[in-house]
Regions:
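Amphipathic alpha-helical packing segments from all-alpha helical-bundle domains
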Residues: 89, 134-180, 190
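Helix-turn-helix
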Residues: 32, 40-82
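N-terminal intrinsically disordered/low-complexity leader segments
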Residues: 1-28, 39, 102-103, 231-234
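Hydrophobic/aromatic-rich alpha-helical bundle segments in the mid-to-C-terminal region
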Residues: 159-167, 176-234
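Amphipathic, non-transmembrane alpha-helical scaffold segments
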Residues: 26, 30, 80, 84, ...
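N-terminal positioning helix adjacent to the helix-turn-helix/winged-helix DNA-binding module
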Residues: 29-32, 36, 188
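A short, mixed-charge helix-start or loop-turn motif at secondary-structure junctions
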Residues: 15-22, 113, 130-131, 155, ...
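Hydrophobic alpha-helical connector segments
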Residues: 91-138, 192
Length: 234
């Protein structure tokens, strides 16, 4: 998991459960512990997160992990919280750039069927770029995401965080499809979310250097075309 030097702004609705810190040094150590726990999640799954293992990974005394996180449940929950914050920061610029690119595409097209298809293709290109970028450059993030999703089936404490994590992406997708011309952006966003999750899971099972881009784009294009069918048929 890529380390982040600066602590991201707390995503709305997320709170930490571990011991609060007031000094910069203490916050850095707490952050180092959580980042170490994230690396373990990627390597060994959530069940590999134990105080001793995290202390060893973070190169801190065992007493440090138990000081900030007396309960292993708090450590796992706060690790997931950090993961969600990192994701929100990591992909925010992509969605901002995508909205700008899509807006420029729409500005230079008309309402004809030909340009409607062009809009579908542009939307597909952006969605494909998003998925391929995550599969090629953020595999650790996606592996951690899969591990936390599985753990949510066992650990009810993580579910509210999982729903927030899902909602952040859905919010971006709703805005994206509304701008693309969807007549039901909320439903389309949820359907696209499920397609993206499926495509990413399949992609994680492949070598990142030999991803089947044609198949990935084909899945996404078909979904976008169905969603924006009314735009193409004008």
């Amino acid at each position: 998991m890529e380390a982040i030097e600066e602590t991201p702004q707390l995503v709305k609705g997320l709170t930490y459960r571990g011991r609060k810190t007031s000094r910069a040094g203490s916050e850095q150590r707490r952050r180092a512990i959580l980042e170490a726990a994230l690396r373990i999640v990627v390597r060994d799954g959530v069940r590999g997160v134990r105080h001793r293992a995290v202390a060893r990974e973070a190169d801190v005394p065992l007493s440090a992990t138990t000081y900030y996180f007396r309960d292993i449940s708090d450590l796992i929950t706060d690790t997931f919280t950090l993961f969600v914050e990192m994701g929100a920061e990591k992909f925010r610029s992509f969605w901002e750039d995508s909205h700008c690119a899509l807006r420029n595409t729409i500005r230079h097209t008309s309402d004809s069927a030909e340009f409607g298809q062009h809009r579908v293709n542009a939307t597909t290109d952006l969605a494909t770029a998003y998925v391929l970028n995550r599969l090629r450059h953020h595999r650790d993030y996606l592996i951690a995401e899969q591990a936390f999703k599985l753990e949510c089936l066992r650990n009810a404490n993580l579910r509210s965080i999982a729903f927030k994590h899902q909602q952040y992406l859905l919010n971006d997708l709703v805005g994206f499809f509304r701008q693309a011309g969807s007549d039901n952006a909320g439903v389309d966003a949820r359907l696209m979310f499920m397609v993206i999750m499926s495509v990413e899971y399949e992609g994680l099972l492949q070598n990142p250097d030999s991803l089947d881009e044609t198949t990935i784009r084909g899945y996404l294009h078909r979904q976008v075309e169905i969603m924006l069918n009314h735009v193409v048929r004008r």
